Curated annotation (Swiss-Prot):
HAMAP family for the chain: MraY
Enzyme category, top tier: transferase
Pfam families: Glycos_transf_4, MraY_sig1
Keywords, ordered alphabetically: Cell cycle, Cell division, Cell inner membrane, Cell membrane, Cell shape, Cell wall biogenesis/degradation, Magnesium, Membrane, Metal-binding, Peptidoglycan synthesis, Transferase, Transmembrane, Transmembrane helix
Protein's name in the database: Phospho-N-acetylmuramoyl-pentapeptide-transferase
UniProt organism field: Rhodopseudomonas palustris (strain BisB5)
Residue ranges of the TM segments: 25-45, 72-92, 95-115, 133-153, 169-189, 200-220, 240-260, 264-284, 289-309, 338-358
Length: 361
């Protein structure tokens, strides 16, 4: 909404600053953080009162969790999504379609996660919505978003897969790109969901990825920078940097309450939504493969589960002591802070590697 203050810049020159994406991104960071900082305690208290016993803990998971995490409320993603939405609505260009498409995916996935969390809390079981039902809904949301992105672009680029490290190598998938893009978004959502198993483990890598894709969106949406870096220019996507800024701010606010020992868990409400958001931004700015690098930690967590399940079904043996892989290291004797901080370091290194692909062409 504040973007419209540009109309007053002729009489009040100071309002001209709202033209700049960088300024509005900074404003979104501050707004998202302040909203969660100020409203967080009220949200946590209300969730604790309504949930009673809090999030049910898996009996087949690490036994220490039955003691250290018992009674902690979930659905903390509501805090993040609220701060993200407020920051976006206040600071983003309200007529930019990319903003609304990505926000729709984020909130849509958030609703699926919220209902899943609600089922778990009310039934006091770690099994919420059936996996098949959840995937069908996620693919419907992601497919609709990808269709909108292809239709919005109305060019061969919008339906193409861009290969990093090469200047002009693209694979035009046509309308099959809708299916590919949907897999990227759904995969990202569920990969982040699997990562969210320890206090602070998911939110910091999400913020690192959001900051990285905020920069990528800004560069890809700027014709001059895109030409200099020889990346594909996607008009209008620069505005997604504001959305990434809002997520970064809301994530910082949430981390204040999610730092060990956590006062609240983000739950599927947050993890599905944030993963879906990262996936949809990657699709919008044509950096789907780079997402697998920057979000490599999430890929590792997801692959560990796939390998574990496949190995057990085919051979009856487990590759890891427990999956996702962060539980494997718990079983090996690593402390929770050791796992979390080391995974954060990995996330930073992967983000730098992903950003390096912008120049290595």
């Amino acid at each position: 909404m504040l973007y419209w203050l540009i109309d007053l810049s002729s009489s009040i020159p100071a309002f001209n600053v709202f033209r700049y994406i960088t300024f509005r991104t900074g404003g979104a960071v501050v707004t998202g953080a302040l909203f969660v900082f100020l409203c967080g305690p009220w949200i946590i208290n209300n969730l604790r009162l309504r949930q009673g016993k809090g999030q049910p803990i898996r009996s087949d998971g690490p036994q220490s969790h039955l003691v250290t995490k018992k009674g902690t409320p979930t659905m903390g993603g509501l805090m993040i999504l609220s701060g993200l939405t407020v920051g976006t609505v206040l600071w983003a260009n309200p007529v930019n379609p990319y903003v609304w498409i990505v926000l729709a995916v984020t909130l849509g996935f958030g609703f699926v996660g919220f209902y899943d969390d609600y089922m778990k809390v009310t039934k006091q079981t770690h099994a919420g919505i059936s996996g098949r039902t959840r995937l069908l809904i996620e693919f419907a949301i992601a497919g609709a978003a990808c269709f909108a992105l292809v239709w919005l672009g109305r060019s061969s680029l919008s339906s193409s897969l861009v290969i990093p490290f090469f200047k002009e190598v693209v694979l035009n998938l046509g309308w099959y790109f809708v299916i590919f893009g949907a897999f990227v978004i759904v995969g990202a959502g569920n990969a982040v969901n699997l990562t969210d198993g320890l206090d602070g483990l998911a939110i910091v890598p999400v913020m690192i990825a959001a900051a990285s894709f905020g920069l990528i969106a800004y560069l890809a949406g700027n014709a001059v920078f895109a030409d200099y870096l020889q990346i594909n220019y996607v008009a209008g996507t620069g505005e997604l940097a504001v959305l990434c800024g809002a997520l970064l701010g809301a994530g910082l606010g949430f981390l204040w309450f999610n730092a060990p020992p956590a006062s609240i868990f983000m739950g599927d409400t947050g993890s599905l939504a944030l993963g879906g958001m990262l996936g949809s931004i990657a699709v919008a700015v044509k950096h789907e493969i780079v997402l697998a690098v920057i979000g490599g930690l999430f890929v590792l967590e997801a692959v560990s589960v796939i390998v574990q399940v496949a190995s057990f079904k085919l051979t009856g043996k487990r590759v890891f002591r427990m999956a996702p892989i962060h539980h494997h290291f718990e079983q090996k004797g690593w402390t929770e802070p050791q796992i979390v901080i080391r995974f954060w370091i990995i996330a930073v290194m992967l983000a730098l590697a992903g950003l390096a692909t912008l120049k290595l062409r």
